[in-house]
A protein has these predicted regions:
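PLP-dependent amino-acid enzyme catalytic core
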Residues: 1-435
Length: 435
């Protein structure tokens, strides 16, 4: 599989280049150039097919021109000692839980996969690379855990003062580890601004072989595609009608990943989500992308620090806009409807749902008519452990789940006793001193 840019279809790079130099110079984002038809393979999987096996097979389908099937299987096995879980909670209602990770965050699937792909690429090239990202918790903790002991990868992580979590003394680069944590005298927004400024400096990007661990990097995003064939492998013998997925939008990464699964011929009949500032419902009830009003070449460059995958989402339907109306079903959800959905999940199924999951379920309830037509089943995507959003749950329900010990340990606050910085130049100078 080759990868092209959302801004220039003449661009064609391999997987290694798309992961290493993850931001195309035209200001767009990398996307798959084409998709293989994997329907026969997807239909062959069943409830005994492990998540790692599915990931290994799909990796081979994505990048078989670069890695052998054995290497692809090894990458997936190392990346995924954990797995999502699909649960049946009612006759036609299922949950897809993505929080069975050390940090309780769905992000860990993509980060672990990206790091193991990158380490393989760098070993083959005899090279090194450095992640540069802003974090307030889960991303940094996941990345530090996964790159621990890796020989070719370092990470520079920017945190607002007092927000470093999930790092241990052995992770610090000054103790022989792989992570350079830097506290910023400012908010998370300031951290992201510094990352953007550094990525705009091409000479620094090339000097340190900088890349990102967020979903601007196609290697991080592709891992989320594996969720949906995995879910289908568990669903296929339990349902006979259509299958719809309802999910929070976030930065649209899981929605795009689900649609990539569909492009690989995954049996799916539609995706439901709450409306956002960018995705609305028109008067006829159809999906409408507000950003499409502005041509790509008139937009700013894609954000390497806090990315939106909306541009990738638009590209999927660029050649067939009518498909958007018959495959993506947004619903406008109010605060009250979100709280009602949260209470319904708890009262009916004893499920603690965070705010984003509750919004996704509320959206599904409002688009119930599309599922009633053919006795369709709904898969509710639950991204992060509900205990990470316990304040909202306690406010809504009067009770909340306890934080599992594995998550509290993985996200423990860390002190580094180093001076704070306030500019991109100070970060660059710190990198020069430590590397």
């Amino acid at each position: 599989m080759k990868f092209t840019s959302t801004r220039d279809s003449s661009v064609s790079v391999n997987f290694s280049q798309a992961v290493l130099d993850c931001m195309p110079q035209d200001g767009g984002l990398y996307i798959p150039q084409d998709f293989a038809d994997l329907r026969r393979w997807i239909l062959y999987t069943n409830e005994n097919t492990t998540f790692a096996s599915i990931a290994g097979a799909l990796t081979s389908a994505f990048i078989n021109n670069e890695f052998s099937p054995i290497i692809c299987e090894t990458i997936a096995t190392k990346a995924f000692p954990f797995s999502p879980k699909l649960r049946k909670i009612d006759e036609r209602l299922f949950t897809l839980e993505l929080y069975h990770t050390p940090t309780g965050s769905h992000k860990e699937f993509g980060i672990s996969y990206l790091v193991n792909c990158l380490e393989t690429i760098l070993t083959m090239k005899g090279s090194t690379a450095t992640f540069l990202d802003a974090s307030v918790g889960e991303l940094g903790a996941s990345l530090a855990r996964v790159i621990r002991g890796k020989k070719n990868i370092k990470a520079v992580l920017l945190y607002p003062r007092g927000f470093i979590r999930g790092l241990s003394e052995e992770d610090f680069i000054w103790n022989g580890g792989n992570v350079l944590p830097i506290e910023v005298d400012g908010s998370e927004h300031v951290c992201h601004e510094i990352v953007r400024e550094i990525y705009a400096n091409r000479s620094i990007v090339e000097k340190y072989n900088l890349t990102v661990a967020n979903t601007a990097n196609i290697g991080r995003l592709l891992a989320q595609t594996f969720f949906y064939p995995y879910a289908f492998s568990r669903l296929k013998n339990q349902v006979s009608g259509d299958i719809f997925y309802s999910m929070p939008c976030g930065n649209y990464s899981n929605l795009v990943a689900g649609l990539y699964g569909w492009r690989l011929s995954l049996p799916a009949n539609g995706f439901i989500c709450p409306t956002t500032d960018e995705i609305k419902v028109d008067l006829a009830g159809n999906c409408e992308i507000m950003d499409s009003i502005v041509e790509l070449e008139k937009r700013g460059n894609a954000d390497p620090s806090s990315p939106s995958n909306l541009e990738r989402f638009e590209e999927i339907f660029a050649s067939n806009p009518l498909m958007l109306k018959h495959f993506v079903y947004p619903a406008q959800v109010s605060k009250e409807e979100t709280e009602q959905a949260c209470r319904k999940l708890f009262n009916d199924y004893n499920i603690f749902a965070n705010k984003s999951t509750s919004r996704a379920y509320a959206a599904a309830l409002k688009r119930k008519e599309i599922m009633d037509e053919d006795d369709a089943s709904l898969v509710l995507v639950m991204r992060d452990h509900p205990a990470l959003n316990s304040e909202y749950i306690r406010h809504t329900l009067g009770t909340a789940p306890e934080m599992p010990e594995r998550i509290s340990n993985a996200l423990m606050h860390t002190t580094i006793n180093r001076p704070c910085v306030s500019s991109a130049m100070e970060v660059i100078l710190t990198m020069a001193d430590e590397f």
